[in-house]
Amino acid sequence: MSEASGRTAGNEMPAKKQKLSSDENSNPELSGDENDDTVSIESGTNTERPDTPTNAANAPGRKGWGKGKWKSKKCKYSFKCVNSLKEDHNQPLFGVQFNWHSKEGDPLVFATVGSNRVTLYECHPQGEIRLLQSYVDADADENFYTCAWTYDSNTSHPLLAVAGSRGIIRIINPITMQCIKHYVGHGNAINELKFHPRDPNLLLSVSKDHALRLWNIQTDTLVAIFGGVEGHRDEVLSADYDLLGEKIMSCGMDHSLKLWRINSLRMKTAIRESYEYNPNKTNRPFVSQKIHFPDFSTRDIHRNYVDCVRWLGDLILSKSCENAIVCWKPGKMEDDIDKIKASESNVTILGRFDYSQCDIWYMRFSMDFWQKMLALGNQVGKLYVWDLEVEDPHKAKCTTLTYPKCASAIRQTSFSRDSSILVAVCDDATIWRWDRLR
């Protein structure tokens, strides 16, 4: 992978030499020609991810949703669209992530991925978005789907992991502007990357090859493979660690959600041994654990591809192509999730967040750092933001964000760590910045 930026010394994240000026880049009222908001980056050619093969309108009927819908009411959060940009490859942008590992006072930096491009931007006051760096994969057929931030535990440098259609994970150091590592192992495209919430070296990847993999990027070892006998039977589309990093919930095209514990003695030992492994001191390769059996599995939540899942405390938020994010938990309401058995067949659905015009797959929601807000875009450029800070989930309030020129499918959203900025990326290669007013 080559970078479009020149090499710069120093500990601060270097910027691209051809920086966009504030006149080209900052557009607080979004007036004038859209071309004024275009970021000039080398172009590439790639195809979109296909639409969902089954129409949600024709999906089979389902039983009741437990305690009812989470109706939309006026939300206490308000946002204003202050800027937009367009990357000139004109291919869908599938992923966006703010770097939440920055310190207070540091610039607000986010990364976007799409086509064979990885691009870093910095948010400035008054709505400005400044282009910092752009990386282009040598293979024009690469199509990046996902990215995740971490940091080097020795130098504290920010690191960005990216992956996509070729199934290769690349680790980029924005300080040195180099792709410092890459990992090959998955037999097909990688749909999502996630770093452990308490260990910056543990990277989780989920793939079209039906499996999840856990990597230690400090020692370059593959700790474990989750899949096989009772694993996913089709593409794994999303996964998430719980806040303590003890459990993983995964979901995929087989309509299922699966729980994998990584705080078992077997997994704790494997992680410890991955840190102790030194290829210079042994001729033996590291032995990866193969986890064939999840600790819980269900297909009772969704009737279509499950393309996004996130933990909310001990509860699960997941969505399919059915115009609703479902809040649920394994077992019965009173059950302790840490004591749920693999044979458990019960699930408790607590409610759902409803929205409209979002029945294509690979549309991912996000939460802010403190899990007080939930954001999702639909296929016509509309953003939904829910206030999660309510005692009764049925009273979760929603605000809908629209802007006339934003009319393409919003693939992913990301909040800045301080929740002051919400960024959305779209199928038409556009990036939209919304600033919080209160």
From Swiss-Prot:
The answer to keyword Nucleus applying to this record is: yes
GO cellular component assignments: ESC/E(Z) complex
Stored InterPro entries:
PcG_WD-repeat, WD40/YVTN_repeat-like_dom_sf, WD40_repeat_CS, WD40_repeat_dom_sf, WD40_rpt
Q: Name one Pfam family in it.
A: WD40
Its localization reads: Nucleus
Its family remark reads: Belongs to the WD repeat ESC family.
Keyword entries, A-Z: Chromatin regulator, Nucleus, Repeat, Repressor, Transcription, Transcription regulation, WD repeat
Q: Name one GO biological process term.
A: chromatin organization
Gene symbol of the encoding locus: eed
- Protein name as catalogued: Polycomb protein eed
